[in-house]
Each structure stands twice: as C-alpha cells, then as structure tokens.
C-alpha cells in the first residue's frame, strides 16, 4: 500500500468522552505485527475497553482487541495482547506525572493510519461523576432540539 498524506480513522472510542473529561491529547505510534496491521487496515479493531499503563518507562496499550486476520493461519497474533506505544521520553515523563494524580487515566481515543503508519490518539482524562454525565446528556439533548428546530424552520 503506497504511503499517502491522508489519514483514515479506523476506530473511535466514543465511550471515552462520556466517561472522562479529556484534558490533553497526544499522538502515539503503535508497534504491531504483520497480521495485526493487516487486520487494523481492514478496520477490525476495538478500543472500547482499552487503557494505557506504564511499565519500565514504556507506554503500553492494554485490552485493545484486534481480530484475527482471516488468511493468517498459524502465524496469527494473539487478540488481546498488550501493544507498545511509541512516544518520546519527555512525553512519557509528563504523562506518568499526570497519571500519578488521583482520578486521572490515559485512554485511547482514535486509531488511524497516517502516512502508512498506525497511530493512536491517546487522551489524558479525569473520570466524570454521575451528575457530570447527566449534565452532558442534558446539554446534548438541548443542542439536538435547537438544531432540529432550526432545521424545521429552514424547511418552511
């Protein structure tokens, strides 16, 4: 596949914006095996339950499910294996310092292909309380009602 300048989003973590107030985002590279990248390019990846932890000064993506490649036979990968994220040392240090505070975690927001490489947009998020989620739902419903009213007004 030729390298292009465009990026194609393959997986979105919609649950992350509902459960966490995202304060900062960073783009990280993904270390994948041959059958993993083929499955990712087909869009067979799920990051709904995924999270990032640090082990020995490295950022590792846990619980990301990449489906088996159909033609991979015995060389297929393990679906739920931990995958290394490629970040600069300074980025890892700042993220480790941020996560050490109470209530903060790092979650993947998007998986996409950029210039032929698999990338992961990770976000530093603070967990939302139940009332925060309800407030967000109320705002979302109000915005939807306003948009609907404006759309109906433009029709007539």
Curated annotation (Swiss-Prot):
Question: Which InterPro entries does the UniProt entry name for this protein?
Answer: SmpB (IPR023620), SsrA-bd_prot (IPR000037), SsrA-bd_prot_CS (IPR020081)
Question: From its record, what is one biological process in GO terms?
Answer: trans-translation
In this chain, the stretch annotated as Disordered covers 130-156
The subcellular location is: Cytoplasm
- Could you tell me where the Basic and acidic residues compositional bias lies? 132-156
Origin: domain of life: Bacteria
Which GO MF terms are attached to this record?
RNA binding
Q: Which GO terms describe its cellular component?
A: cytosol
Q: Does the keyword RNA-binding apply?
A: yes
Task: Identify the main location.
Answer: cytoplasm
Q: Which keywords does UniProt give here?
A: Cytoplasm, RNA-binding
Stored SUPFAM superfamilies: Small protein B (SmpB)
Family as reported in the entry's similarity comment: Belongs to the SmpB family.
Provide the function of this protein: Required for rescue of stalled ribosomes mediated by trans-translation. Binds to transfer-messenger RNA (tmRNA), required for stable association of tmRNA with ribosomes. tmRNA and SmpB together mimic tRNA shape, replacing the anticodon stem-loop with SmpB. tmRNA is encoded by the ssrA gene; the 2 termini fold to resemble tRNA(Ala) and it encodes a 'tag peptide', a short internal open reading frame. During trans-translation Ala-aminoacylated tmRNA acts like a tRNA, entering the A-site of stalled ribosomes, displacing the stalled mRNA.
Listed HAMAP family: SmpB
- The name on file for this protein is SsrA-binding protein
Instruction: Give the source species.
Output: Exiguobacterium sibiricum (strain DSM 17290 / CCUG 55495 / CIP 109462 / JCM 13490 / 255-15)
């Amino acid at each position: 596949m030729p390298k292009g300048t465009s990026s194609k989003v393959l997986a979105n973590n919609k649950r992350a914006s509902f459960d966490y107030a995202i304060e900062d985002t960073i783009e990280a590279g993904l270390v994948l095996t041959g059958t993993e990248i083929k499955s990712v390019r087909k869009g067979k990846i799920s990051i709904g339950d995924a999270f990032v932890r640090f082990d020995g000064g490295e950022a590792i993506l846990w619980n990301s499910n990449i489906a088996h490649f159909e033609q991979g036979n015995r060389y297929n990968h393990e679906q739920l294996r931990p995958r290394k994220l490629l970040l600069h040392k300074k980025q890892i240090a700042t993220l480790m310092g941020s996560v050490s505070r109470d209530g903060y975690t790092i979650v993947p927001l998007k998986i996409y292909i950029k210039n032929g490489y698999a990338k992961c947009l990770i976000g530093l998020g603070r967990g939302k309380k139940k009332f925060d989620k309800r407030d967000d739902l109320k705002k979302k419903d109000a915005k939807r009602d306003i948009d609907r009213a404006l759309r109906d007004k433009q029709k007539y």
